[in-house]
């Protein structure tokens, strides 16, 4: 099968077909280019995804990756990054092995096609020229023959006419002979050109066109083979990265299999273990005995040994004690200390605080009661610890990590000691290196001045001394913590509320069990334990008592947001219960729905005191 013999008359169609083949090849190149762009975009998105979920340095997330599940996730992210790299390899290989080669091949193919069809058109033009020459000689021969016939007929006519002179007859005869000769010459020329054309036409259809079409056929077949090879390469590029992608997936599976739930559980224990013992049982208090009730064993009141006893004046302790349940102490400590805000500019004249309808109540101000409570010496140390604990909530971490539970504090101190030892070792190595260099300079003065190293050596030595002092300080704290951790029976006993006749030990060790020598443990997860020394002591005494009774009502004149601790928000026109009158500091204590209470500016409410409350 040959296009030269089978398609000898389909020159134009072959030209269109070969152009279509080049278009198909360019279309495939465009497809591969778009595939490479997709692979690059996909790889970029995968890398961004992996980077997005990587733990941030020096953040809490980085600490979370000590758990095996988080480590496995981190390994998954790293494997995903390698997975993305393989898609980049696919893109690069497709570009270098397919796109670049095909683009170059298309240019060569276009040039070869152009050359072949140029030769074909040239041969076609040549045969057309020969055909035109043949037609021209044929027409000339035909014309000369007709002219010769007319000249012969004219001569015969003149020769038959007796009236024509002999000279005219001779002239007609010569003209007929000339025309006859011209016809013979045209015939010979036509015969020669016809013979030549037939030769050219045979060569055109049996030699030139078959050769040209054969080249075009070979060119087209090479194009088809090349596009097939490119498709194979396309598949092989993908196949080459499959083993590596499989390794990435195997890495993810291996990371998943490395997850150890027991190990993670142990890490949680190590991270959050406080070192405290759980509280013991609470002793039954018999209220049927006709005796004066005392506060619970681990409260801050005086012991049976005659130590000063905390007095709460007034008829009702619930009325005088400004705390309720778990938040009793915190309510006292977080009550507003700043002056109340002034009322809005549209204050009505009727809203006059502390007017005739608000006589002064016969009770000591809350601040006076708190000061009296604080002056009890056995309690001062406990409250000082609590005060330090509350100050730590501002975000300042003590140097000795006293805001951490004992177990966590020990780990922090141990880590600090290890870090300092590493720094000491680093500085020591540097000092040794400088000393050796100085010895070299002393032996070989031409290499350097030994005195130039004295300043650096003194600086490094000073740094070592500072670090050693720092390490010694933390080691002392660490030894103190490690020495206290085993002694937990007394601590549990103190937390349980058992009264053993040693209240002075409770008071003395109140802060020591809850704090380090320079601060108290006040982390949010253990805030309740932090003030159990206070809150637990008083909960037994006051949990069963009724809330402070209402001494009147009030109507909100303006809306108050109540954003500070100890305050409560009110809405204009709202009616609430008054449980404590203004003591001269500009704040009135109110209650809503028997469970919400707090302070509002006296100028924001209109107070109506009960007559019975005024007289009490």
Swiss-Prot record:
InterPro entries: AH/BAR_dom_sf (IPR027267), F_BAR (IPR031160), FCH_dom (IPR001060), FNBP1_F-BAR (IPR037449), FNBP1_SH3 (IPR035492), HR1_rho-bd (IPR011072), SH3-like_dom_sf (IPR036028), SH3_domain (IPR001452). GO terms for cellular component: cell cortex; clathrin-coated pit; cytoplasmic vesicle; cytoskeleton; lysosome; plasma membrane. Residues 552-608 are annotated as: Interaction with DNM2 and WASL. Keywords: Acetylation, Cell membrane, Coated pit, Coiled coil, Cytoplasm, Cytoplasmic vesicle, Cytoskeleton, Developmental protein, Differentiation, Endocytosis, Lipid-binding, Lysosome, Membrane, Neurogenesis, Phosphoprotein, SH3 domain. Residues 67-259, 398-490 form a coiled coil. Residues 502-511 have a biased composition (Polar residues). Residues 549-610 form the SH3 domain. Residues 280-314, 332-365, 494-531 are annotated as: Disordered. This is Formin-binding protein 1. It comes from Rattus norvegicus (Rat). The gene is Fnbp1.
